[in-house]
């Protein structure tokens, strides 16, 4: 599954976007590695106060071209990350991803959930069905098995948001 995230990252068009991540391991790091392998630029939003704090927390540093620090905590980092994003892409994930998706709903950010990754991403779609969100969230779901479609949907959402 990590390889699938790396492949998705390698398919994103580096001349059309910058990838923002929470600068953590797992899917975000793999996607960033794939994106950078094609010359893409990755900005990591660290929950740490500085690089030493980031490394001490066990977070990777190899796949970010820039690292931003000093958000005042994890939740503040999540808000800053989502606020800066044009489109939110979720590959599985855990509590941090859930929080970022909820922030994206409140900020009316377009979201792309890639199904086929273990974690909260696909479950979030079911959760939204149970809620009465107004206005309704701008969310699209694509299957991870069709990486080209996932990338196309994400790139289209980013282009649409850019105007």
Task: Describe each region flagged by the PLM.
Residues 40-41, 45-48, 55-72, 125-159:
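Structural recognition of alpha->loop->beta junctions
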Residues 4-10, 16, 22-101:
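Acidic/glycine-enriched connector segments
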Residues 19-20, 112:
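Hydrophobic residues within beta-strands of alpha/beta enzymes
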Residues 70, 75-147:
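C-terminal binding/interaction regions
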